Amino acid sequence: GCPWRDLPASFGKFQAIYNCFNRWSKKGIIHNIFKILSADADKEWLMMDGSHIRAHQHSAGAAAHSGEDDHAIGISRGGATSKIHLIVDACGNPLEVIITAGNVNDVSIAPELIAAVDLAETEVVSADKGYDSDKLRAQIEEEGSKANIPYKRDREEKNKDMDWYLYKIRHLVENAFARLKHYRAIATRYDKLK
């Protein structure tokens, strides 16, 4: 990842590359390529989580042509951030990605993540306590899967139905974030494109 102006001249004019990328992004072409690549996923177990990404000063200060939500950059305790919400298969391969402002709660995006993935083959959906919600559990169970999400400490329900072995395998989603953040453009946001 680098600023658009720093692309090698052999690629062509940076404005043309930027316009092509932006056009493909708006038309959903990049998303469709991702969907085709993830078609043969092992969906027996799914894991989901969210991770913050710092927004570089160049992305946070660029002129806005549309609403703030279009750029998924929010202000939180760590400054300007974005958040990647990710659901991965049993092998740790990403199935669905949603990018929001950094101050968006995980559980508020989870229904959209679940709706974007076909749970017909899925036995268990695993997530951390940040996804503790009766509404989310009901959505997962309506799809025919089991929600393996621990209750928060302040809830009366106990975690007697938890499969702690599968919960430990949830590290696959953390590993996916680690792999993604090896790429400079993902570890730090450099532009306002969503």
Where are these regions (language model features)?
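Short alpha-helical elements
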Residues: 1-194
